[in-house]
Amino acid sequence: MAKSLLCSSTLNPFFSTTLSSSKKNQIAYSGNSKNQTSSSLLWKRRELSLGFMSSLVAIGLVSNDRRRHDANAAILEADDDEELLEKVKQDRKKRIERQAVLNSAVKEKGYLQDLVYKLSKVGQAIENNDLPAAGLVLGKGIDTEWVKTVNLAFTKLSTSPEENTEVEAFNSSLASLITSVNKNDIESSKLAFVSSAGAFEKWTTLTGLLEQLKGL
């Protein structure tokens, strides 16, 4: 009994101390756990806050870039509009000047109208295989008076490289036509006539005379 009591009285303080220490450790651990949880939540909140702020900054930068891009695009578009408007003005000015020249070129248009009639007669003669009749209209060479007057009209009314190119093509084809007709070469005459008439029609289209000359 005494031994039992001794053991009991000896062990109780040890168990009490152990239990007390264990409870303190549990409380301390619980406290540390709560502190760690609080710290973890705090860090998460900070991370979320920083992430949100970073997103706002990124959105702001993108918005600024877009605004700058839109502003630059607006400036370029305005420049394009001004260039287009200036081009329209220049084209209109050229058309007015060209029309004034055409309206005043009464004599030159008369020369060109005579050319239309001659080409029509030559075309009919070639179609009928009547090259002598075509030769009477054309003459013997390109140094005839009507060819000279036609080229005077070409020179006065041609204002662009494209128009001058068609004049050169016409004169070259006309020379071939006169030569072929005088040689009584029907096939070459047909080809040369088509080339001459085509070049002249293109020239009248470029100069704006297509609607002013009869028979085209």
From Swiss-Prot:
Localization: Plastid, Chloroplast thylakoid lumen
- Record's keyword annotation contains Transcription: no
Organism field: Arabidopsis thaliana
Q: What is this protein called?
A: Thylakoid lumenal 16.5 kDa protein, chloroplastic
Give the UniProt record's GO annotations in the biological process aspect. Answer: photosystem II repair
Q: Tell me, in one coarse class, where this protein mainly resides.
A: plastid
Transcription is among the record's keywords = no
Which GO cellular component terms, listed alphabetically, does the Swiss-Prot or TrEMBL entry include? chloroplast; chloroplast envelope; chloroplast stroma; chloroplast thylakoid; chloroplast thylakoid lumen; chloroplast thylakoid membrane; cytosol; thylakoid
Residue span of the annotated presequence: 1-38, 39-73
Which UniProt keywords are given for this protein, alphabetically ordered? Chloroplast, Plastid, Thylakoid, Transit peptide
